[in-house]
Amino acid sequence: MDYKEAGVDVEAGRAFVEKIRQNVESTFRPEVIGGLGGFGGYFQLPSGYRQPVLVSGTDGVGTKLKIAHSLNCHDTVGIDLVAMCVNDVLTSGAEPLFFLDYLATGKLEASQLAAVVSGIARACRDSGCTLLGGETAEMPGFYSAGEYDLAGFCVGIVEKSQLLDGSKVQIGDVAIGLASSGVHSNGFSLVRKIIDTQGLNWQDCPEILAGSSLGEVLLTPTRLYVKPVLELLRSGLDIHAMAHITGGGIPENLPRCLGKGHSVQIYCESWPVLPIFHWLAQMGSVNAEAMFNTFNMGIGFVIIVPSDLARSTINQLQSSGINAYQIGEVIAGKGEIVGLD
């Protein structure tokens, strides 16, 4: 008996690395030293920093992967994986430098996992972030046939004096909401429960989705905010704080960037809620509080700026192709989000 007979094909693993090599290397920034295959990836810090601070983040895609498995559609969840990590790192004012992925599966299906990596590489290129390395673990008996799980890890850099830690936030600042592309990568356990309870399937096309299927809409990848937000930072715009709206929605995530003594008054009518959220609320009998505490509700990222910069911030974002809205203002408080009822 050998390792292959036990369910782990080492040669297939080596062949897989060669299959994805070109895609991975297409993400390399000039700071990369060496290539794939070593015990670690090497990355030289960019020049020009006086007091560089490294910012790290890690995340996954959650049970959104169940939909990808059901539909045999694997080229977008890699985008989700990168977006969940780089958007988090971005909130500190940091530029994402490099990304690593962990991919675990019961049996290595090369074409399936190559599609996943193609999405990872695409998102890394779109974010100016190197895919520096990763791990593909074949774990027979641990995952069902055709299933896999993903985790991502990102490191970014910011000048210490420009680190956004909530200390700049002031009463009277305004919250600029950047539109999400859909459900992104949070709340999918509730999504799947609603689908199952209603006896629906991913190919169904509710009228409210204007001809698109549930699967198409729900697999829409998480929006990458790196390029437009870095453009704002590099333009010298006085950004006071930023938040990535992920699990827990606006109530959970926006207070994390505020610092002490501040709350935010949100104006719920100030942005359009996407049709998929209306559909989920109706079909699942989910009240407004639960919706806001589970989903992004159409706002995937929030930037806090002085009130006199609101219009110019929105204009710059819209010129970058991101719909943006003035969704609230900073008030005195203890980290509450007011107005979501």
UniProtKB/Swiss-Prot annotation:
Its EC number is 6.3.3.1. It catalyses: 2-formamido-N(1)-(5-O-phospho-beta-D-ribosyl)acetamidine + ATP = 5-amino-1-(5-phospho-beta-D-ribosyl)imidazole + ADP + phosphate + H(+). It is found in: Cytoplasm. GO terms for molecular function: ATP binding; phosphoribosylamine-glycine ligase activity; phosphoribosylformylglycinamidine cyclo-ligase activity. GO terms for cellular component: cytosol. Keywords: ATP-binding, Cytoplasm, Ligase, Nucleotide-binding, Purine biosynthesis. Pathway: Purine metabolism; IMP biosynthesis via de novo pathway; 5-amino-1-(5-phospho-D-ribosyl)imidazole from N(2)-formyl-N(1)-(5-phospho-D-ribosyl)glycinamide: step 2/2. SUPFAM superfamilies: PurM C-terminal domain-like, PurM N-terminal domain-like. GO terms for biological process: 'de novo' IMP biosynthetic process; adenine biosynthetic process. It comes from the Bacteria. It is an enzyme of class 6 (ligase). The lineage of its organism: Bacteria, Bacillati, Cyanobacteriota, Cyanophyceae, Oscillatoriophycideae. This is Phosphoribosylformylglycinamidine cyclo-ligase. Belongs to the AIR synthase family.
